Amino acid sequence: MYSGRTSYDENTRQLYKLDDNGNFVFVENISLDNYFDLLIDIYRTNDPIDELDCCFKLHDMDTNTNNISDIIKASHSLPVNMGHIDPVFYLGYPVIFIIGVTYFSIIASRKINPSDRLLNEIKEYRLTCQNVYRKKFSINFV
């Protein structure tokens, strides 16, 4: 697993960290469970680079799979099987989708206040993180 500040080699169970010169340096041998705990501890810090780094890695670890075709089959199995059972259920998906789009584009947009303090804080946090990543690691997009 590789990301901005740390790298973990699952085969050799070695943890590497990025030093001030931009090189990955071996730190210690660590198990995958301990690495997961380390990421959670780092994620709780206030450093936005470490927080984003750990967030991406934790997400990768949670969604890791070796067989992508099983995921694709599973994601398509429900509508196909329901279509064989009863076409009304299968044809209901587009209707529900249209109702959802209509609701969120017309009705819900009136209820959401774009000047909401929480939304502004999230936008500021995202911009701050993007700027830090762009400057520190020369990344164009986050």
Curated annotation (Swiss-Prot):
Designated name of the protein: Uncharacterized protein R213
Cellular location(s): Membrane
Glycosylation sites per record: N29, N67
Alphabetical keyword list: Glycoprotein, Membrane, Transmembrane, Transmembrane helix
Domain of life: Viruses
Membrane topology summary: Single-pass membrane protein
Transmembrane in keyword set: yes
Annotated transmembrane regions: 88-108
GO CC terms of this entry: membrane
Main location: membrane
